[in-house]
């Protein structure tokens, strides 16, 4: 596996990343055991960059991923999630306020069973006021 540093962060990530949207049933339903096994296999094979969002499966992807991550040493992966776009009960919402972004990070850490998240991305900024994203989010 080839690894590259993200800018000057010191974070070295695999060229192939694990996009966890499918753990939330975004494309089709997946058994939780299969989803967790997929995470284990990816990390075991050297894929150390995992990307997810609370929006994927309306929190389900983070919840399922968290069950897998609980069993993997924290130094084996770089974790990325997002703020700004959310969903619940089939309803999509966007909130780029600093307050909601901060709340979202803590909520994600709880669902993911981690003490910290390495990277936070702003999800779907085309729906946001860019001044708010730059100055507040």
Residue spans of the language-model regions?
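N-terminal binding-site loop/beta-alpha segment at the start of enzyme catalytic domains
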Residues: 1-77, 115
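Active-site beta-loop-alpha junctions enriched in small/polar residues
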Residues: 21-23, 53-55, 82-86, 122-125
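Conserved catalytic core of Hanks-type protein kinase domains
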Residues: 42, 82, 111
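Generic structural signal for helix capping and beta-alpha/helix-loop junctions
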Residues: 59, 86-89, 126-129
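Generic beta-strand or strand-like secondary-structure segments
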Residues: 64-68, 82, 100-107
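Structural motif corresponding to the early beta-alpha repeats
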Residues: 72-98
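Glycine/proline-rich, positively charged
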Residues: 92-137
């Amino acid at each position: 596996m080839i690894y590259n540093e993200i800018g000057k962060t010191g974070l070295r990530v695999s060229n192939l990343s694990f996009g966890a949207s499918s753990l939330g049933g975004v494309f089709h339903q997946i058994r939780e055991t299969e989803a967790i096994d997929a995470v284990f296999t990816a990390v075991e094979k050297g894929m150390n960059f995992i990307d997810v969002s609370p929006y994927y499966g309306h929190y389900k992807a983070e919840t399922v991923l968290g069950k897998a991550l609980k069993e993997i040493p924290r130094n084996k992966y770089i974790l990325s999630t997002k703020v700004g776009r959310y969903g619940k009960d089939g309803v999509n919402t966007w909130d780029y306020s600093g307050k909601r972004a901060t709340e979202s990070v803590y909520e994600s850490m709880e669902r993911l069973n981690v003490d910290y998240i390495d990277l936070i991305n702003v999800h779907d900024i085309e729906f946001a006021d860019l001044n708010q994203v730059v100055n507040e989010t």
